[in-house]
UniProtKB/Swiss-Prot annotation:
Phosphorylated. Phosphorylation is enhanced upon serum stimulation. SUPFAM superfamilies: RNA-binding domain, RBD. Residues 1-59, 209-234 are annotated as: Disordered. The modification Phosphothreonine is found at T38, T41. Component of the eukaryotic translation initiation factor 3 (eIF-3) complex, which is composed of 13 subunits: EIF3A, EIF3B, EIF3C, EIF3D, EIF3E, EIF3F, EIF3G, EIF3H, EIF3I, EIF3J, EIF3K, EIF3L and EIF3M. The eIF-3 complex appears to include 3 stable modules: module A is composed of EIF3A, EIF3B, EIF3G and EIF3I; module B is composed of EIF3F, EIF3H, and EIF3M; and module C is composed of EIF3C, EIF3D, EIF3E, EIF3K and EIF3L. EIF3C of module C binds EIF3B of module A and EIF3H of module B, thereby linking the three modules. EIF3J is a labile subunit that binds to the eIF-3 complex via EIF3B. Gene3D superfamilies: 3.30.70.330. It comes from the Eukaryota. This is Eukaryotic translation initiation factor 3 subunit G. Signal peptide: none annotated. The modification Phosphoserine is found at S8, S11, S42, S189, S223, S264. It holds the Pfam family eIF3g. It comes from Homo sapiens. SMART domains: RRM.
Length: 320
């Protein structure tokens, strides 16, 4: 196999290794052996040593923008930077468009259009949701019913009025006999009712002890005269008003809130359907005083309630 010395042209990779491991720049020496697109092997005139740096160039072709810049690194080597951008058209509100046309000031007075990473931080869009007052009330923490009972006395001692049982009172042996003796001296009742002259002795205690049946005529209170409710009923009839033209969704609580400002109410009767439970359209309101009922008629009659005009008048007295 013949051997001999021959001159070989160094490859492009060897030249890159000899020049150094700096991959940021492309010098004119490296471009000598690289064929250009036009077939010319001469380097770009902008990268020749001693030539001034040309200004940046922008070329827009449709929606593609190409920006070409020339810079010099720390070693004095020239290099070219080519950046390609895709232009997108986005719709924005008029207020946002006007803010983009504002002139920059301060440290960003000479910055190009767009945000500067040194002074501006671009983050994700945050959407703000406003809640109503009802939702705000629902978000409030519900009060614990046990916290209300903390300040109340559940157990009260009959001797010292402390918050413990009477059987566990530490002053039971000292204050108990003293209170009993004082009550006897003052003639206070100790729980047993004194018998009045001519009054029959109640048989209720005997019934509890023996368990025998006691007829109603011999029970406690049998000698007292019964009270008639007829006068009270007549008073209710005199202070009762009749409300008509009510909606089907009306409830007794609605009538209570509507007529409560005029005076004290004794009873409310709302006529309802037996099957559906809805209002039949009329109701009766009884006040304790006739003056309050008169003011309710003057104030509510002709009043618009639940998209209906109410009619209020005096109720006819019952014939029973």
């Amino acid at each position: 196999m013949p051997t001999g010395d021959f001159d070989s042209k160094p490859s492009w990779a060897d030249q890159v290794e000899e020049e150094g491991e700096d991959d940021k720049c492309v010098t004119s020496e490296l471009l000598k052996g690289i064929p250009l697109a036009t077939g010319d092997t001469s380097p770009e005139p902008e990268l020749l040593p001693g030539a001034p740096l040309p200004p940046p160039k922008e070329v827009i072709n449709g929606n593609i923008k190409t920006v070409t810049e020339y810079k010099i690194d720390e070693d004095g080597k020239k290099f070219k930077i080519v950046r390609t951008f895709r232009i997108e058209t986005r719709k924005a509100s008029k207020a946002v468009a006007r803010r983009k046309n504002w002139k920059k000031f301060g440290n960003s007075e000479f910055d190009p259009p767009g945000p500067n990473v040194a002074t501006t931080t671009v983050s994700d869009d945050v959407s703000m949701t406003f809640i109503t007052s009802k939702e705000d009330l629902n978000c409030q923490e519900e009060e614990d019913p046990m916290n209300k009972l903390k300040g109340q006395k559940i157990v009260s001692c009959r001797i010292c009025k402390g918050d413990h049982w009477t059987t566990r009172c530490p002053y039971k042996d000292t204050l108990g006999p003293m209170q009993k003796e004082l009550a006897e001296q003052l003639g206070l009742s100790t729980g047993e009712k004194e018998k009045l002259p001519g009054e029959l002795e109640p048989v209720q205690a005997t019934q509890n002890k023996t368990g025998k049946y006691v007829p109603p005529s011999l029970r406690d209170g049998a000698s007292r005269r019964g009270e008639s409710m007829q006068p009270n009923r007549r008073a209710d009839d005199n202070a009762t008003i009749r409300v008509t033209n009510l909606s089907e969704d009306t409830r007794e609580t609605d009538l209570q809130e509507l007529f409560r400002p005029f005076g004290s109410i004794s009873r409310i009767y709302l006529a309802k359907d037996k099957t559906t439970g809805q209002s039949k359209g009329f109701a009766f309101i009884s006040f304790h005083r006739r003056e309050d009922a008169a003011r309710a008629i003057a104030g509510v009659s002709g009043f618009g309630y639940d998209h209906l005009i109410l009619n209020v008048e005096w109720a006819k007295p019952s014939t029973n």
